[in-house]
Amino acid sequence: MTEMEKMLAGEPFDFTAPDVAESLRRRRVNQAHFNAVSFDDGKAYDEALSALIPHRHPTARIMPPFYCDHGHRIQLGEGVFINAGCTFLDCGGITIGDHTLIGPGCRICTPQHPIDFEERRKPVETGLPITIGEDCWLGAGVTVCPGVRIGARSIIGAGSVVVHDIPEDSLAAGNPTVVKRKLR
C-alpha cells in the first residue's frame, strides 16, 4: 500500500513520501494560481478553483487568499462560501454541507500527530475527517480540530476552538467550544 493510499484510508502515513510530496507539489502550483487570479474574472476564477478543489459544487465560492494541503480531499456543497484567509489541512478529508458560511481566517485541520514524543519525531501523521453540516455558520477565526463533526444549522462563534462534536441546531462558542443554547 502506498503512503497516499494509507492517507486516503485514514491510516498513519509518511507525509514525506514521494507520492504524498507530489500531491503537495500539485497543490502548491494550483494554490498559487488560484490566489493570483482575480475574483472578478469569473471564468479564470472558476477554472483555478476547480483545479485546486475538484470536488465542489459549481456555486461554492472561496475568497482568496486560501491555503490547503492537498485540495482533492475537500468537498464543498451547493452555495458554500469561504471568506478570505482560511487554511484547510485536508489529509483526512473535509466535507462542508450546502449553504454553509465560513468566516475569514478560519482553520480546519484534519492532521493528528502521535502523542508519544519519540513517535512524533517520525514524519508520520493520521488524518481524521471533519464534517460540517448544511446551513452552518463559522464566525471569523474559528479553529476546527481533527475528527470533529458540526451538526446542520449550527453557529460557531468567532475565535472558537472546536475540539469535540457539536450537535445540530446549536449555538456554540469558546475555547474549548461549548454549546450555549439550542437554535431550534
What is each stretch, according to the model?
Residues 149, 163-164:
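Active-site/ligand-binding-proximal alpha/beta "capping" segment
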